């Protein structure tokens, strides 16, 4: 049976600008969407102009003071927020730019809407390439990330799903997501990333395994410079298979940061676009409801190629290596192909012995897991997104969610042990 895929894209999200010289370029989202359109992939998906997340949505995870600050600060008034800029780590890596809160609202709303659609079985796979900002913390911005759309989406998924698996293939450790769920067995976090030599964010050692109820439900795979497709595959596939077998997630969130590709402006790995895509294809093969998000990626043309290719893999559609002509065609010079050679001269410092050592340690940690922790069943809290919204229909929107209804059995609703009032946050 073909997967039903929802794809979320806000036509304005690529127009935001972090500032001159900043490596994070939201414009990469416009390039990605253009390729998705010109390859005709949009015909195989339900395409939605996403919901905009509110301050209330963001405060599911973040502190009210921090979100209130993001909503109020602007380049014109930031001189009056000197203390807050320091407190909330907003400045160099995470600058104040025009429309900052609006940008956060758009990418977070799309991820949240994807989670809600998965909960309501409107789709089997939800894609938001604008999301995946995994470094943001409860009280502060970090690593180009302001609002952690991943954590907010997982909290929404936990209303219906007893166990959510989070997988991160960005070159940087998914520290914000790990920190949020470090003490719970409701979410298992698995991150493959560069570790050592003071590489940002400096966390993600394989001995960070979770604590309290979450002990051994946090898995880190620290890698060295220059890892290639073959080495990555030899670790990724057995580790993820073992995790899925042990944990039996009912939903998976996959962060597809493209800075793990070779030739990335801030990266030091040697993955090809096909190698990166293999990870996405492998996760999809488990046929578990899947939320697919973007993340890092700083060589814009290759980010667009990568996420377009991965969209095609999720749709099981073959697309040509020859790029279709589009308004951004010149970005892909000189070869104008989907799969250019992105290998670098960086030596693969991940020896067989090192990879085997990691694999053994990871598998030892997995043996400590309880198989598939169970969760007490409660009434489900109300949805973050109200399906009864009376917004005017958007003429640009291909599908309207109001058209989808599904009978729901009471025993489909999972929640934490202390939360059954239909109003408050999911207890983790």
UniProtKB/Swiss-Prot annotation:
Inositol tetraphosphate (1D-myo-inositol 1,4,5,6-tetrakisphosphate) promotes the histone deacetylase activity by acting as an intermolecular glue between hdac3 and N-Cor repressor complex components. The gene is hdac3. It comes from Tetraodon nigroviridis (Spotted green pufferfish). Responsible for the deacetylation of lysine residues on the N-terminal part of the core histones (H2A, H2B, H3 and H4). Histone deacetylation gives a tag for epigenetic repression and plays an important role in transcriptional regulation, cell cycle progression and developmental events. Histone deacetylases act via the formation of large multiprotein complexes, such as N-Cor repressor complex, which activate the histone deacetylase activity. May play a role in the regulation of the circadian clock in a deacetylase activity-independent manner. Residues 386-405, 415-428 have a biased composition (Basic and acidic residues). This is Histone deacetylase 3. It is an enzyme of class 3 (hydrolase). GO terms for molecular function: histone deacetylase activity, hydrolytic mechanism; metal ion binding; protein lysine deacetylase activity; protein lysine delactylase activity; transcription corepressor activity. It catalyses: N(6)-acetyl-L-lysyl-[histone] + H2O = L-lysyl-[histone] + acetate. Its EC number is 3.5.1.98. The keyword Cell membrane does not apply. The keyword Zinc applies. One of its GO terms (cellular component) is cytosol. It is found in: Nucleus; Chromosome; Cytoplasm, Cytosol. The active site is at residue 135. Zn(2+) binds at residues 170, 172, 259. Coiled coil: none annotated.
């Amino acid at each position: 049976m073909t997967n039903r895929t929802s794809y979320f894209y806000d036509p304005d999200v690529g127009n935001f600008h972090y500032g001159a010289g900043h490596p994070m370029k939201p414009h990469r989202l416009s390039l990605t969407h253009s390729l998705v359109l010109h390859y005709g992939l949009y015909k195989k998906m339900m395409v939605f102009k996403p919901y905009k997340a509110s301050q209330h949505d963001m405060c599911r995870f973040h502190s009210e003071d921090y979100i209130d600050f993001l909503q109020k600060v602007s380049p014109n008034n930031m001189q009056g927020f000197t203390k807050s800029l320091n407190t909330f780590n907003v400045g160099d890596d995470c600058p104040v730019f025009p429309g900052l809160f609006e940008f956060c609202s758009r990418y977070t709303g799309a991820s949240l809407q994807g989670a809600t659609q998965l909960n309501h079985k409107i789709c089997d796979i939800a894609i938001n390439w604008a999301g995946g900002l995994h470094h943001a913390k409860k009280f502060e911005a970090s690593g180009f990330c302001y609002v952690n759309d991943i954590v907010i989406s997982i909290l929404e998924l936990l209303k219906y799903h007893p166990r959510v698996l989070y997988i991160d293939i960005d070159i940087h450790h998914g520290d914000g997501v790990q920190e949020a769920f470090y003490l719970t067995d409701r979410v298992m976090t698995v991150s493959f990333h560069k570790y050592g030599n003071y590489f940002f964010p400096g966390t993600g050692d394989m001995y960070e395994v979770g604590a309290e109820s979450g002990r051994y439900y946090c898995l880190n795979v620290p890698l060295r410079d220059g890892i290639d497709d073959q080495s990555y595959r030899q670790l990724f596939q057995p580790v993820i298979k073992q995790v899925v077998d042990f944990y039996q997630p009912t939903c998976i969130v996959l962060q597809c940061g493209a800075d793990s590709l070779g030739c990335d402006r801030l990266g030091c790995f040697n993955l090809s676009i096909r190698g990166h895509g293999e990870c996405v294809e492998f996760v999809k093969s488990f046929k578990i409801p899947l939320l697919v998000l973007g993340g890092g990626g700083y060589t814009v043309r290759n980010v667009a190629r990568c996420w377009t290719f991965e969209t095609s893999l999720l749709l099981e559609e073959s697309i040509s290596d020859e790029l279709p002509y589009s308004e951004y065609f010149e970005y892909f010079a000189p070869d104008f192909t989907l799969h250019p050679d992105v290998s670098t001269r960086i030596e693969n410092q991940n020896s067989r012995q090192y990879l085997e050592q990691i694999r053994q340690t990871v598998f030892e940690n997995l043996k400590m897991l309880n198989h598939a922790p169970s969760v007490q069943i409660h009434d489900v809290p109300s949805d973050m997104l109200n399906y009864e919204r009376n917004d005017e229909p958007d003429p640009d929107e291909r599908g309207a969610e109001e058209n989808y209804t599904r009978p729901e059995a009471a025993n489909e609703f999972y929640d934490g042990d202390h939360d059954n009032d239909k109003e408050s946050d999911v207890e983790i």
